[in-house]
Amino acid sequence: MEDYKFLFKIVLVGNAGVGKTCLVRRFTQGLFPPGQGATIGVDFMIKTVEVEGEKIKLQIWDTAGQERFRSITQSYYRSAHALILVYDISCQPTFDCLPDWLREIQEYANSKVLKILVGNKTDRDDREIPTQIGEEFAKQHDMYFLETSAKEAENVERLFYEIAAELIGQARSKDGSASAAAAAAQRQSEGGSIGLGSFSAKAAQSNCCGGLASGGGGGSNSSQAG
């Protein structure tokens, strides 16, 4: 039987085609699946990692972006420890729909859930949403922020490891560990996080559009599923 100290449930949400599936597979399998199709309903993968000397099991749930699956995916919000809200930096409509996703999160998720805004596909050279706009949106809504590229593996491991570190800090804090706040502050001072709005966003340059009612997938050279 596998030994681990913590089990955390992380749920990815966002429009179809923003790259949710590719982020999950890049982190859990080290793969970028070209031509990845849309997620049907909900899928999940597990990865055990070591963070701050603790063995952590991450249960990562990949949800469909299509409207017809919404009632299914909403049921997974409430038990989530962290919610990653993903948009495509090269597709304005995926950013414009963020308020709709946030309303869902506020309605169905635990009020204390850790929320992270992720601008994916930074390998793309046709950026439509500047990094600063993403950062400002995250700060306005008390979310952490990071830009990633599942295709180039840019900031993908960092995203999940920092989430795990934050969740460990919360768990220790609940257990009365006085060092939790200090550890979190140290991570921030070392560039792990910038206040409550950012995981220290570091832009590079990644595609695929998809309205809130479209699909959950994305692609190869020019797109990342999700």
Language-model regions, residue ranges each:
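Switch I (effector-binding) loop of TRAFAC-class P-loop GTPase G-domains
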Residues: 29-55
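Conserved alpha-helical scaffold flanking the Walker A/P-loop in AAA+ ATPase domains
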Residues: 45, 70-75
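Switch II (G3) loop of P-loop NTPases
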Residues: 56-69
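Conserved Switch II/interswitch segment of TRAFAC-class P-loop GTPases
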Residues: 79-99, 109-113, 122-128
